[in-house]
Amino acid sequence: GYWSRGLGDVYKRQITDGVKFASTLGTIMPVFSSPLLQYMIKALPFSSIMKILLRHPRNDRKMIFAAMYFGNPSKKIPFMGVNNYVDEVIKLEKLFSDGRNFFYNTFSHVDINLMCVFNRLVDLGLEETVSHKTPHIYAYWEKLKSRNSYQNGILNYYTDKEKELLSEFYKNNDSSVLKAILEQIDKKL
């Protein structure tokens, strides 16, 4: 029953909802985003970090914030998602190879979610991963970018502060993760 599994199991299940670490596009994006997140955390004043450490409800997140502020764990984290990401890209490429315009043929929440995922790839300098040997995903992404909702709901959200932060991040960001992803795509396609 409920109590025989222990509260730790229940807590773990509530947080992960049964999804393994970096196993889906939705769980891989935070892994790929860790260098950007660390860049943003390091830009915070120490007092903000202390507020997070004192007030954040999740201890695991507190530890991540502290590690990113005082250390440099994000250099290796993105590589943990490369293989699963490439597998997900290949699945999408096969799905869109039937000529459909959207995930379910008509624009849906899945397309909105993928729009957000692909836009995050742009933010991270990884957009090439959805066009390298994947013409069907590339065509789909171009359709998504041409929608007014992309401009109004995503691009118009960025303020000058976000644009400046991303520009600074790009200056310090190496392309080793991009290279690793493209190499895996080359191997698997």
Predicted regions and their residues:
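GST-like fold's C-terminal all-alpha helical module
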Residues: G18-E142
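Short, thiol/selenol-centered motifs that function as redox-active sites or metal-ligating centers
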Residues: G8-V10, D111-I112, R147
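Long, positively charged, glycine-interspersed low-complexity recognition regions
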Residues: S131-L189
